[in-house]
């Protein structure tokens, strides 16, 4: 059986067993007034909770009200009905403990079943459900009147059980119940809507923060910062819904605070991004400044290169001009010697041993015959010696030409190397190319001239007019001319064998010079130019009136010259040459102490204290005491007031001490050559003096004065002796 739809009591199926019908009265503990009292306004959440509780207890409340209204009627009907049941079925017993437990289970079950009609009443809000229970009471009365029939009673009561109801209270109007249900429904719906809106708002806020964190960094690098504010702010529609749903001032204030926090976050991040960007730009500016400085230094170095090339071009041009002048002089000398030799060979009839036995015909034949005597005697030994001398001169000139050719070839190689090293478009390149072209032409001219020598006729005639036989003690005009050109050439003319040996040694020296040039990586034409300058200065130097002796090589090989020189001239003072030396005054300083300090720092990297006369005199005596031939030099030292002041201090402000020591060494070398024929004994003079004033370590820092001095010194007989000793 199913429950009756018009009954306020909940009827449930009891199962297949025949359960007794029990009518329960109102509960004594319930207060009808407390149930009918108006409820205070509550929050939406509490109203929803009470609504659910009311839904569960709805059936009980209605049944209690109905039972309270029809209390006397039900009591009468129950007694009548009980009597009928007892009369009809005397075997039915009162419920026992098992029935009580089953009754408890059934009491819990109708509560679940009774939720459905109560919830349907709330949703439909039908007013007839909340009306008074008078129809129900009538239905119960009709049921009680018809209960006299056994069949009807069995049909109506079998398997049914009535729930316990509450005490009936004051009935409420239907309109009041409908309004309360509607308010409760709206409260629950409003609370649900507010919670959904808050969830949507929270999700939008989280979404905005995510976009700000992950999208704001990438957009800050591209530049626009306004888009970050647009992405972070919530949608306008969502704000409107939030305000309409909440309807509370506190929620609006909270929303404003949230928006302010969201607005402040991107501003801080934008400031951090701007600071990072400024730091990067500052670093880039520093890098650009460093690059500009490097480019500036490179441009300055490139601008200084043409100046160096111009200086090198000028040096090479001067060396070329000197080589050309020396070549022209040698060519003229060689032509004269060839003409003289051919004239002698033409006028002389040679014998089996190669000697001139008879003079030929010619204008000079009579003169020769007169000089030799009317008997036609053989030529004197002086003539033969002069002939050999001329042959030696010719051979020496050939060797000198070959030497000049090799020197010009080395200069040409240096020029070609310079042209290769110089860059294209350099203004000095044209001058270097012109010098190389001129050198190549000179080399070809020398080769052609050596193969096809020209012999002018007037030269031989002029030579035949000169006397051929002169005293050995009186030098001939040719010898005087050679003395004006330079005493160093006579060594070649006198001794052919020694000339060839010296040529070999010179070749070895030249090879060493070439190796040095390759190691240094730059041309050393100035060395060759220094040699040529020395030769020209010696050749242009007039004969000295003081009668300075010839070099040691000529004195050793030809004692007659030495004897003649001693007979004709008085010996020079040992230190006389030192006073003729021209010194250059130091520049950029004033005062003895300042100039001495500047000189020491410039040449040795160490400050030089003013040199005292007594200290230098002691050093000179110590050095000269080691030389056996230097005894007379110690008697009168070259320490005149021209070099030292009244206080005995060297005049550093008038001449450099370094130049003074160089002059002393040159004078000692000349004296050594005159005494021993060798100048190697005094090569360590400078090192001895400078090591005392500066120390041994300072000698390594010298600016190359020794090499320059050797270049200027390698002229004359010493130029030939030094390589010969090394070889």
UniProtKB/Swiss-Prot annotation:
Its main location: cytoplasm. The keyword Cell membrane does not apply. One of its GO terms (molecular function) is transcription coregulator activity. Residues 39-53 have a biased composition (Low complexity). InterPro entries: CCPG1/PBIP1. It is found in: Cytoplasm, Cytoskeleton; Nucleus. Residues 498-544, 551-568, 716-727 have a biased composition (Basic and acidic residues). Residues 1-10, 61-70 have a biased composition (Polar residues). GO terms for cellular component: cytoplasm; microtubule; nucleus. Keywords: Coiled coil, Cytoplasm, Cytoskeleton, Microtubule, Nucleus, Phosphoprotein. The modification Phosphoserine is found at residues 43, 130, 134, 147-149. A motif (Nuclear localization signal) lies at residues 488-506, 696-719. The keyword Hydrolase does not apply. Transmembrane segments: none annotated. Interacts with ESR1, PBX1, PBX2 and PBX3. Interacts with TEX11. Regulator of pre-B-cell leukemia transcription factors (BPXs) function. Inhibits the binding of PBX1-HOX complex to DNA and blocks the transcriptional activity of E2A-PBX1. Tethers estrogen receptor-alpha (ESR1) to microtubules and allows them to influence estrogen receptors-alpha signaling. This is Pre-B-cell leukemia transcription factor-interacting protein 1. It comes from Bos taurus (Bovine). The lineage of its organism: Eukaryota, Metazoa, Chordata, Craniata, Vertebrata.
